[in-house]
Amino acid sequence: MKLFSWNVNGLRAGLKKGTFMDFIQAEQPDILCLQETKAKPGQAEVDLPEYTEYWNSAERAGYSGTAIFSKVATDSYSQSFHDEIQSKSAWQDDSYGNPLNEGRLQIAEFPNFYLVNVYVPNSKPDLSRLQLREQVWDPALVSQLKLLEQSKPIVICGDFNAAHTEIDLARPKTNTHNAGFTKEERQGITNLINAGFIDTFRQFHPEEQRYTWWSHWAHSRENNVGWRIDYFFISNSLLPKLKSAEIHENFLGSDHCPVSIELEF
């Protein structure tokens, strides 16, 4: 089973450029998770009859959003934190809106695992959303995963908007206090790993400096001055089923590239 995740930075743009369909035809994913779709169902005309589509779009037009395209039938689907977890967290509107209404979470149940697709809030250049990340979103996500894991193993993927360690970005020293590499954001990923979830790429590529996102500025992609902020994590119990984990830098059309894993059941 081939699972892919890709922050497409606007699905309509990818469809217009042809890069999205080129990717689908080349890789034929069994399950595809998208982030930053920036569209509601029907706004992006995707002609993929072999896939069932699940959309979680932001209330704000042209912003955020996630989607799952699956050839595999789901047992259940939801797009919110469990009520108990949601009620325990101090979700508040800010200048960007309410993070619960931004289409950032999808939970699809399959026969052998739960798949969680996330577009984690960016802390913003002024770090105005760092407190949301550290105190609300990251703890709620771990709680949600551990609750689901009581029933089935977890696959979680998406854009986490944070590089975990110094080998996960080209210029760690100059980004120590910048959004995406603050100690709080890095600790959030450490907490996820400490909760028992495995960074699949590092299982196969423990020392490789490869990236999934590049700034639009200063020819960053051409010079490979990037960040690894897109991940697949899995429950430890799925490790024997994990056959590969890859980054696909050759696919263009977004400031991110796709990442993938292969599971064999």
Q: Predicted regions span which residues?
A:
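N-terminal, active-site-proximal structural segment of metallo-dependent hydrolase catalytic domains
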Residues: M1-L48, T52-Y54, A58-T66
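Active-site beta-strand/loop signature of hydrolases that rely on acidic residues for catalysis
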Residues: W6-N7, I24-G42, L115, Q144-E166, ...
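Structured beta-strand-rich core segments of catalytic domains in phosphoester-bond hydrolases
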Residues: K38, A44-P125
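Metal-dependent phosphoesterases centered on the DNase I-like endonuclease/exonuclease/phosphatase
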Residues: T52, W137-V225, I229
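Short Gly/Pro-enriched turn/cap motifs at secondary-structure boundaries
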Residues: N56-E59, Y96-N98, R221-N224, E249-L252
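Conserved beta strand-loop-helix elements of the APE1-like EEP
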Residues: A61-Y77, S220-P240
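Active-site beta-strand termini and strand-to-loop segments that position acidic
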Residues: K71, A108-P111, S235-N236, I261-F265
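Active-site-proximal loop/helix segment associated with metal-binding centers of metalloenzymes
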Residues: Y114-Q131, R171-E185
